[in-house]
Swiss-Prot record:
It comes from Klebsiella pneumoniae subsp. pneumoniae (strain ATCC 700721 / MGH 78578). This is Ribosomal RNA small subunit methyltransferase G. InterPro entries: rRNA_ssu_MeTfrase_G, SAM-dependent_MTases_sf. PANTHER family: S-ADENOSYL-L-METHIONINE-DEPENDENT METHYLTRANSFERASES SUPERFAMILY PROTEIN. S-adenosyl-L-methionine binds at residues 73, 78, 124-125, 139. Gene3D superfamilies: Vaccinia Virus protein VP39. One of its GO terms (molecular function) is rRNA (guanine-N7-)-methyltransferase activity. Keywords: Cytoplasm, Methyltransferase, rRNA processing, S-adenosyl-L-methionine, Transferase. One of its GO terms (cellular component) is cytosol. Specifically methylates the N7 position of guanine in position 527 of 16S rRNA. CDD domains: AdoMet_MTases.
C-alpha cells in the first residue's frame, strides 16, 4: 500500500516525507479495521480509501491560509486527519457529534502520535470558537448556505470557509446569505478519482 500511495502522490505532484507516508498508510489501516465494526465510511476497499479519502483530502493543503483550522462534521477524520499529517505546523480541531467517530479519532491521535489535532464531540452550533479559527473546513455540508449558517461563529474576522465539493454549482454559490463573498473556486485534480472536485473558498464580508 505504501508503494501505491507513493505512486499516487507522484501523479498529484505532492512531496511528503517517508514518515508522513507511513502515517497516512497507518491511518488507512486503522480506518479499515474500525470500519468493520463501526461503519465509519461507505468505502470498504483500503486501496480506494487512498484515492477517495487520503488524496482527496490532502490535495487542498496548498490553498489553506493560517495555522488554526476546524474540520466540521469530520466523521472519521476527513479531511482533518490527512491534512494534520501533511501540515504538521498547523493545528486541526476535529468536530463531530457522534461518540463512536470521536473515539476512533482519539485512537488515531494516540497511535499516530498526532499532537496537532484535537478531537471534540459536539454539535457545531454548541461549540464555542474561542479563539476563532483561521479556517473552517468541511466536506460534510449539503450546501454552502448550510455551511456558513451553521458555522458563522467559527472563523476569525479575516478567516475563511473552505468547502470541499463535487460540482461547484452557480445557483448554490449565488444563494449564499448576505454577509459572505466567494473568494475563489478552485478546480481540484485528484488522480484516479472519477467526477469533478472543487474547493470553494468563502470569507465573511466584514474582513
Amino acid at each position: 500500500m505504501l508503494n501505491k500511495l507513493s505512486r499516487l502522490l507522484d501523479e498529484a505532484g505532492i512531496s511528503l516525507t517517508d514518515h508522513q507516508k507511513n502515517q497516512l498508510v497507518a491511518y488507512v489501516g486503522l480506518l479499515d479495521k474500525w470500519n468493520k465494526a463501526y461503519n465509519l465510511t461507505s468505502v470498504r476497499d483500503p486501496n480506494e480509501m487512498l484515492v477517495r479519502h487520503i488524496l482527496d483530502s490532502i490535495i487542498v493543503a496548498p490553498y489553506l491560509q493560517g495555522s488554526r483550522f476546524i474540520d466540521v462534521g469530520t466523521g472519521p477524520g476527513l479531511p482533518g486527519i490527512p491534512l494534520a499529517i501533511v501540515c504538521p505546523e498547523s493545528h486541526f480541531t476535529l468536530l463531530d457529534s457522534l461518540g463512536k467517530r470521536v473515539r476512533f479519532l482519539r485512537q488515531v491521535q494516540h497511535e499516530l502520535k498526532l499532537d496537532n489535532v484535537t478531537p471534540v464531540q459536539s454539535r457545531v452550533e454548541a461549540f464555542p470558537a474561542e479563539p476563532p479559527f483561521d479556517g473552517v473546513i468541511s466536506r460534510a455540508f449539503a450546501s454552502l448556505n448550510d455551511m456558513v449558517s451553521w458555522c458563522h461563529h467559527l472563523p476569525a474576522a479575516n478567516g475563511h470557509f473552505y468547502a470541499l465539493k463535487g460540482l461547484a454549482q452557480k445557483e448554490e454559490m449565488e444563494s449564499l446569505p448576505e454577509g459572505y463573498d466567494i473568494v475563489e473556486v478552485i478546480e481540484l485534480h485528484v488522480p484516479r478519482l472519477e467526477g469533478e472536485r472543487h474547493l470553494v473558498v468563502i470569507k465573511p464580508k466584514s474582513s
